[in-house]
Amino acid sequence: MNNTDKLDSHTPMMQQYLRLKAQHPEILLFYRMGDFYELFYSDAKRASQLLDISLTKRGASAGEPIPMAGVPYHSIENYLAKLVQLGESAAICEQIGDPATSKGPVERKVVRIVTPGTVSDEALLQERQDNLLAAIWQDARGFGYATLDISSGRFRVAEPADLETMAAELQRTNPAELLYPENFEQMSLIEHRHGLRRRPLWEFELETAKQQLNLQFGTRDLIGFGVEQAHQALRAAGCLLQYVKDTQRTSLPHIRGLTMERQQDGIVMDAATRRNLELTQNLSGGTENTLAAILDCTVTAMGSRMLKRWLHMPIRDTKVLTDRQQAIGGLQDITAELQTPLRQVGDLERILARLALRTARPRDLARMRHAFQQLPEIHRLLQPVNVPHIQNLLSQVGQFDELQDLLERAIVETPPVLVRDGGVIASGYNAELDEWRALADGATDYLDRLEIREREKLGLDTLKVGFNGVHGYYIQVSRGQSHLVPIHYVRRQTLKNAERYIIPELKEYEDKVLTSKGKALAIEKGLYEEIFDLLLPHLPELQTSANALAELDVLANLAERAETLNYNCPVLSDKPGIKITGGRHPVVEQVLSEPFISNPLTLSPQRRMLIITGPNMGGKSTYMRQTALIVLLAHMGSYVPADQATIGPVDRIFTRVGAADDLASGRSTFMVEMTETANILHNATEQSLVLMDEIGRGTSTYDGLSLAWACAENLASRIKAMTLFATHYFELTTLPEKMEGVVNVHLDALEHGETIAFMHSVQDGAASKSYGLAVAALAGVPRDVIKRARQKLKELESLSNNAAASKIDGSQLTLLNEEVSPAVEALEALDPDSLSPRQALEWIYRLKNMV
């Protein structure tokens, strides 16, 4: 219920609630009442379903019972985490007035808005995964796209050229929340995503966006960021920044700049390629047996997130890549020693974001202190490493002795979770705080003495002094001894087996204790905020340090992986082509129980396309994918699973590997296959690496073979891309005779009787047969079916020159050299000018009989 027209008919408290709710109509409003956050009306119904909490009713307002649901204040974060995972947002409304001095309802206001893309609390985040907020814009000039990781301050923009590139960006970044304009036309691109937020058009206004961004960065213009003319991207960035300011309700000092991502800087991979190569997610949607699962042994969460960004954004800048390679080489001897202090650094990046948002908790500051304490050891280990990039990173890491000293003096060794729990600031840091604490502690000592004195004086062995939040301090005596208490004991509370009393002396000390504790807590909160003020001026250097530490973690991890998994340093060449000796699939070799068979590969301007034939299960797909993964690893600066590798310039990686029906979009397997193929033929260049696996198998044999042939021809002669073309159509093995730069290779297998051994080794030349029946037998197809299939195969092979045999779907017999019809031959031999009308009529009957 969001109707505020008849506020007067509601109670004062519900009037206050409805006014606040009207400001946040589309999200759940958690309204603080004492020890609970309550939700009312439609919010209560929705929350009870989403969070599995009880739906009750609270009295009545405007003559109607009020649906209500609530959660305890101390467990709110658990419920928010669940909402965020469901793509929902929530407004948190706190009591900011004093109940003792308030006339009518206590003053309340919304102090924060939690949304999937703007959370920074560690309880709400997956620690080894980026959590991005994104905004998308589209007009006649193309797309604009902006992403922000509020938990690090990383702000990126791009202008994807077309729908395909935009889809790839969405898949790569996978935002937790996506803002889009109300007139967005390509809803099919985003409608299946969680966390969609429709925004009014004026939030994407260009001049407003520029003003917002300049104000945030403290600049006069955006020329220094290289985005001044990127109008579509700036519209998206402006909307995104405004949304963050609206939800965070605080300044954002950790967002200090904007980076333009340009397609030409990296290796472009479309959405299908990212999916097929299983970089961070497997085809089932899980994370097992992915490249990241094998490669990621980083010791910090921020390092893990950086590694995954590198995986998804292979770069082309050979200077950066060579720096990384040299750093990996330089770290190989000290990896284990370096990872020990790095592990202790923890997730400094996200702690700094919470510091910037002033939401850092006491334990965040303790972790920051612990991170600073590791820096001297990191410097000691890295100073002897004579690699320029390592020394550059080390200078960025820096040392923060003064801040370390501040936190060592100010924060206790093991602080509580929240400032409001007290006991965060260390003794000796502030004299006034120590005085009030001494008063509180002294009063506590007095109460202990009072208990002993009263027990001995009255001879009541069950007497004890206690405290609870409702009744304050009390003297408790068992029901059996309650008749023995003196007259000045005033009864405060009756329990089943005991009575509780108050005496004037106890009341006096209660006031003293509560006053001193309250005063100490107030001072402590003030000092805690002051510590933020002392740390925040150093935020830029701290962020630089955290980024350098994350990169050191990634490089040390890649050094360890190279050593453990026997990877070698690839050579990055400016000459076109790819030459790999002893290449292996990084994931498959770790999953296999038997040794992995390594294979060579050579692609060059004279050897542009490999036509790959061989049995199913022979390893064609593995061979193709491992080539793409080796190229990708080389372009993130990593060592690669090969004895040697020389990689020339690569601008894009395309894969047309396997397919499944896209039922959600109503597209068949063949339609998916052809869409991906069209994308390759439109966008591949001479420097692209293209993997084509079983093209044309989703339709009839004639159609499929014709398409496969035409695609192979186009890639080899017009585009001249570096192509691995796996096929079951043996007709394609004649392509090398017809075209330059095309070569046959095959995966070897040995057949013995009815059994088959896959050798998994790549040999020159075409495969002699497909071994399909042997594979079927391995798969458990019944023996009588296999036997019948062998009979049929012999029949078909004996009819291999008969055109009818070529119509059997999936056969690998000659299909292109069709027999010429006798009727056609007779027609070609005829001279129509020499025929009389009678002869012509006879020929028509004769031809009819031939057909």
UniProtKB/Swiss-Prot annotation:
Protein origin, superkingdom: Bacteria
Keywords linked to the UniProt accession: ATP-binding, DNA damage, DNA repair, DNA-binding, Nucleotide-binding
GO cellular component: cytosol
Keyword Transit peptide carried by entry: no
Any Gene Ontology biological process: mismatch repair
UniProt cross-references to CDD domains, sorted A to Z: ABC_MutS1
InterPro entries xref list: DNA_mismatch_repair_MutS, DNA_mismatch_repair_MutS-lik_N, DNA_mismatch_repair_MutS/MSH, DNA_mismatch_repair_MutS_C, DNA_mismatch_repair_MutS_clamp, DNA_mismatch_repair_MutS_core, DNA_mismatch_repair_MutS_N, DNA_mismatch_repair_MutS_sf
SUPFAM superfamilies: DNA repair protein MutS, domain I (SSF55271), DNA repair protein MutS, domain II (SSF53150), DNA repair protein MutS, domain III (SSF48334), P-loop containing nucleoside triphosphate hydrolases (SSF52540)
GO terms of molecular function: ATP binding; ATP-dependent DNA damage sensor activity; damaged DNA binding; mismatched DNA binding
Positions bound to ATP: 614-621
Purpose: This protein is involved in the repair of mismatches in DNA. It is possible that it carries out the mismatch recognition step. This protein has a weak ATPase activity.
Family per record: Belongs to the DNA mismatch repair MutS family.
The name this protein goes by in its record: DNA mismatch repair protein MutS
Annotated gene: mutS
